Amino acid sequence: MSCVNIRGCCIGEGRPKVIIPIVEPTETAILEKAAEFSTLRADCVEWRIDCFKGAKSLPAIVHCAAKLRVVLKDQLLLFTFRTKAEGGKVALAHEEYLHFIRTVLATDCADLIDIEFFTVGAELPALIEEAHTAGAAVVCSSHDFHKTPPRAELVSRMVAMQQAGADLPKLAVMPQSRTDVLELLAATAEMADRHPETPIITMSMGALGAVSRLSGEALGSAMTFANPGQASAPGQVSLEVVNEVLDALHL
């Protein structure tokens, strides 16, 4: 598997890198949480902007982003606006979403930016190129909170993300059975073995899929989301447990 190197952090090499989400509603609370997170054992902080009360105010986002970058120092910062269609808090029209992405890129504060595969559609390659020009790596994401598609579909979706230029294809799906969890894990291993051009991030959500958040080094998922006190998705495991298990399973 190839490696994405950001601020000396090699994503795709060794132990999966740990992401912890900020989901607070106000700038004050966000910055307080960031100061707390800067002392924790985590590689990356995700700002879930759709949880921010100013989510539809671009000036408020820009103002908070600049302060957040300073507080986190050299900790990786991932910007995410999870749309309502993909499990987030706020609905955005297509043009609003594109404008948001471009506004965040212009701040020069993002190490990584989440771009939703289906939300952007045909404009994905051009938007990824814009992100790279701005110096941000792209997490290209797809979420299904209802089911787990067949393995072939999961693999083809991640390959399409790679072909569009994404640095880190990401899939999150909901299992309805143990077999669904195995489908996601098998798709992850297949991608890592047969399409190692980029690292990938995968997870099977909910309690049933929690094993997928902990087995990344062996099966091919380069990053995992942990719960530092407040989860941003179903099935996130506590940061303490994630670190303990990743250490125990380190190859």
Task: Enumerate the language-model features and the residues they cover.
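Catalytic alpha/beta core domains of metabolic enzymes, predominantly
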Residues: 112, 117-251
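Active-site beta->alpha loop and helix N-cap motifs at the rims of alpha/beta catalytic domains
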Residues: 2-3, 13-133, 143-148
